[in-house]
Regions:
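Low-complexity, highly charged intrinsically disordered N-terminal segments
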Residues: 48-53, 57-70, 74-81, 86-94, ...
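Short glycine-rich His-centered loop
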Residues: 18, 22-33, 41-56
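Short boundary motifs at domain starts and secondary-structure transition points
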Residues: 33-43, 106-108, 204
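ER/secretory pathway lumenal C-terminal domains and tails of membrane proteins involved
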Residues: 8-11, 32-37, 70
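Glycine-rich beta-alpha loop elements in corrinoid/cobalamin-binding modules
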Residues: 85-211
């Protein structure tokens, strides 16, 4: 959430690739599926990561994730990539080699994006969310985050009672996310174009006022 457009971060696949031979089901980390979307970084004013806090095999079939992925990428001025929880074998290797949580499409660090949207379908995803934030290098507590960190928001069934994770998120979206994701993208874009008035707290106040 820096005041200037984020510089394009480098992908991590060259560092990640040697580790994949040492893990189970490495194909889940490669990406490149049919209909995957990867827009040039400079073509987007708002960069999203849509994360399902479980493994690829559990999260990829989720219809809500697929819908939001399509909606955001159809905006033209915003883009969305996906991220999933990694299995313990790869997590251990990533931590040992200093590699952070990454996106599936470009393998860029999750922390380099503007918005991290997490779909919490069950309470079991809450601990995976915290683990992913830690692996990404994003401060766990929302009041410790700076302009260099993404906005962390949750949606899905568990968002109707956000209190268990209230200290760790910036925004909870209640109900269907199709319209909300567009409005959130517009707010973040307009706030940035205006020079980021009020800093991180400024955009959070605008988001809170939307109800």
């Amino acid at each position: 959430m820096s005041e200037q457009p984020r510089p394009e971060p480098a992908g991590l696949f060259d560092e990640l690739s040697p580790l994949l031979a040492q893990v189970v089901t490495p194909v889940q980390y490669v990406g490149g599926e049919i209909n995957a979307r990867l827009r040039p970084w400079g073509d987007s004013q708002v960069h999203w990561v849509l994360m399902y806090p479980d493994t690829y095999g559990v999260g990829q079939p989720n219809q809500g994730l697929a819908i939001l992925y399509e909606v955001i990428n159809e905006l033209g001025w915003a883009s969305a990539e996906r991220s999933f929880s990694v299995w313990p074998d790869l997590e251990a290797l990533m931590r040992a080699h200093g590699l952070p949580q990454f996106t599936l499409e470009s393998h860029r660090p999750v922390r380099a994006y503007d918005v991290l949207g997490v779909g919490l379908s069950t309470e079991l995803g809450c601990t995976n969310l915290l683990n992913a934030l830690d692996l990404a290098g994003v401060p766990l507590h929302s009041d410790e985050r700076t302009m260099d960190d993404p906005l962390v928001l949750i949606g899905g069934h568990c968002a109707f009672n956000p209190e268990p994770v209230a200290d760790f998120i910036d925004v909870a979206v209640l109900g269907d996310g199709e319209e909300a994701s567009v409005e959130l993208s517009r707010i973040v874009r307009d706030w940035r174009l205006a020079g980021c008035p009020g800093g991180r707290d400024g955009v959070l106040e605008v988001l809170a006022a939307t109800g």
